[in-house]
C-alpha cells in the first residue's frame, strides 16, 4: 500500500501493476504500469479517477488510508477507459453518499460499462470550462476530446496550480522502477495518442493559458520540475516534427538476402558519419519501438520482399501502424526483393499516398533474389542521399 503527498492537500493513491505483460493487449511493458489516482483533502473531498479492476482492494485501501475516517464528497471521472474507471461501482458502493462528477459523454459510457448501476441524484454533470469549489481548492474542467477517447477531460486546480492531465503526459512503467521518461513516454504517446496530434495541439494551447506547476497524469510519474521539457516534447510529437536527426531501417527478410542489404546499408551509413542509425527486424523486434523511432527520427528506410504479389505481413502491419498515426514530414527510402516479379517498392509507396509531406529518395534498391554489384552501388547511392 503506497500513498504520497503531492501538494498541500493532494495525495497520490494509485497502484503499480507488475502482473501485466501487454498493456492494452499489444504494448510490451517489462517494467509494468502505474494506474494513478489522487485525493484532494478540503472542506469537500474529491477523489480523482479510479484504477484497474485487478487492484480494487489495494486502491480502496490507499484511499481509506488518506481519508482517515473522513467521507469523500466527489469522485471525478476524467476518462472512462477501464484501467482508470473500472472501480467506479466499487467506490460508490463503499461510499454510497458520494457524488460522481463527469461530463455527459462520460455518464453515457458509464451506463454502458456498469449496466444496472443507478447513481440517482448522485450525479454532477459538468460543462467545458465549468468549475467546482471544494473549499480553498477550485477545480476547472477542460474538455480534451480524442486525447485519446471522446469523453476525456482534464482538471486544473488553480490553488496548487496542478493539472490533472488524464492520459496526457503519461508513460509506460510502474512508479517503483526508475527509468528515462522520454523513451517510454514517447512510445506510450506514439502508440496510444499518436493519431490525434491536432487534438493534443488544441489541449496544449488551452493549457498554455494556465499557470501549471505540477502535472498529475493517470500513468507514470508526477511531473514537478522542468515542465517546459515535457510540454516541448508533447508539442514536437503532436505536430509530427522531427525530434532527432537519424535513420531508421525497418525490414522483413525470409532467407537473409534482404537482411544482408540492410546490414550493408547500415554499415555504409555509419562509415559516412550518419548521426544515428537504428535497425529493426519487424518479425522479431518490438513493433512499438520501431514505430516510436520512425516518428522520432527524420528518415526511414523500408526493406522487404515481394510476398503473394504484395509485401510481407510484418511490413504491412508496420506501415499500417505508421499511416494510421498520421506519419508525415519524413524522408523515406525503399528496398525491395523478389525472385521473379518484385513489386514491393510500388506497394509500399502506395501505402503512403495519403501521408503528408513525404519526400522519397531518388534511389530505390531492386534486388533480384540476392545482392548484385549494381545493388551494392545503389546502396552506396542511398547512403549518400540519407547522409545529406
Q: Which sequence ranges carry the predicted segments?
A:
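Short, charged N-terminal beta->alpha structural module
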Residues: 250-271
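FMN-binding flavodoxin-like domain, especially the glycine-rich phosphate-binding loop
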Residues: 175-215, 219-222, 264-280, 290-388
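Metallo-beta-lactamase
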Residues: 4-8, 102-152, 196-202
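Active-site metal-binding motif and surrounding structural segment of the metallo-beta-lactamase
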Residues: 43, 54-101
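Metal-dependent phosphodiesterase/nuclease catalytic metal-binding core
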Residues: 39, 154-216, 221-251
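Active-site neighborhood of phospho(di)ester-bond hydrolases with catalytic His/Asp-centered motifs
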Residues: 48-50, 72-80, 100-103, 163-167, ...
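Conserved beta-strand hairpin/beta-sheet module of binuclear metal-dependent hydrolase folds
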Residues: 3-63, 154-157, 161-165, 258
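Short acidic active-site motifs
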Residues: 87, 286-290
Amino acid at each position: 500500500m503506497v500513498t504520497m503527498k503531492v501538494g498541500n492537500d493532494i495525495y497520490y493513491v494509485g497502484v503499480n501493476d507488475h502482473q501485466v505483460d501487454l498493456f492494452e493487449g499489444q504494448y510490451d511493458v517489462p517494467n509494468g504500469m502505474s494506474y494513478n489516482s489522487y485525493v484532494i483533502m478540503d472542506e469537500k473531498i474529491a477523489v480523482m479517477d479510479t484504477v484497474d479492476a485487478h487492484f480494487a482492494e489495494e486502491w480502496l485501501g490507499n484511499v481509506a488510508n488518506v481519508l482517515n475516517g473522513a467521507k469523500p464528497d466527489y469522485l471525478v471521472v476524467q476518462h472512462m477507459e477501464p484501467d482508470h474507471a473500472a472501480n467506479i461501482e466499487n467506490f460508490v458502493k463503499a461510499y454510497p453518499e458520494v457524488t460522481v462528477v463527469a461530463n455527459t459523454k462520460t455518464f453515457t459510457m458509464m451506463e454502458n460499462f456498469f449496466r444496472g448501476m443507478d447513481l440517482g441524484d448522485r450525479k454532477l454533470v459538468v460543462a467545458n470550462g465549468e468549475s467546482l469549489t471544494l473549499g480553498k481548492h477550485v477545480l476547472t474542467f477542460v474538455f480534451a476530446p480524442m486525447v485519446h477517447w471522446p469523453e476525456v477531460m482534464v482538471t486544473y486546480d488553480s490553488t496548487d496550480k496542478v493539472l490533472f492531465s488524464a492520459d496526457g503526459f503519461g508513460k509506460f512503467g510502474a512508479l517503483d522502477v526508475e527509468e528515462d521518461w522520454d523513451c517510454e513516454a514517447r512510445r506510450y504517446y506514439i502508440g496510444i495518442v499518436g493519431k490525434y496530434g491536432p487534438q493534443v495541439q488544441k489541449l496544449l494551447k488551452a493549457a498554455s493559458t494556465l499557470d501549471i506547476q505540477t502535472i498529475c497524469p493517470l500513468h507514470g510519474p508526477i511531473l514537478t520540475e522542468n515542465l517546459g521539457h515535457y510540454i516541448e516534447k508533447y508539442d514536437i510529437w503532436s505536430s509530427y516534427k522531427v525530434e532527432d536527426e537519424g535513420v531508421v531501417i525497418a525490414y522483413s527478410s525470409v532467407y537473409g538476402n534482404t537482411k544482408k542489404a540492410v546490414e550493408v546499408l547500415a554499415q555504409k551509413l555509419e562509415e559516412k558519419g550518419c548521426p544515428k542509425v537504428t535497425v529493426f527486424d519487424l518479425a522479431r523486434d518490438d513493433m512499438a519501438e520501431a514505430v516510436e523511432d520512425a516518428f522520432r527520427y527524420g528518415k526511414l528506410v523500408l526493406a522487404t520482399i515481394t510476398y503473394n504479389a504484395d509485401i510481407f505481413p510484418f511490413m504491412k502491419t508496420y506501415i499500417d501502424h505508421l499511416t494510421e498515426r498520421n506519419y508525415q514530414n519524413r524522408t523515406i527510402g525503399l528496398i525491395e526483393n523478389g525472385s521473379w516479379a518484385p513489386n514491393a517498392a510500388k506497394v509500399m509507396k502506395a501505402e503512403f499516398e495519403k501521408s503528408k509531406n513525404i519526400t522519397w529518395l531518388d534511389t530505390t534498391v531492386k534486388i533480384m533474389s540476392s545482392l548484385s554489384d549494381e545493388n551494392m552501388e545503389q546502396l552506396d547511392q542511398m547512403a549518400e542521399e540519407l547522409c545529406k
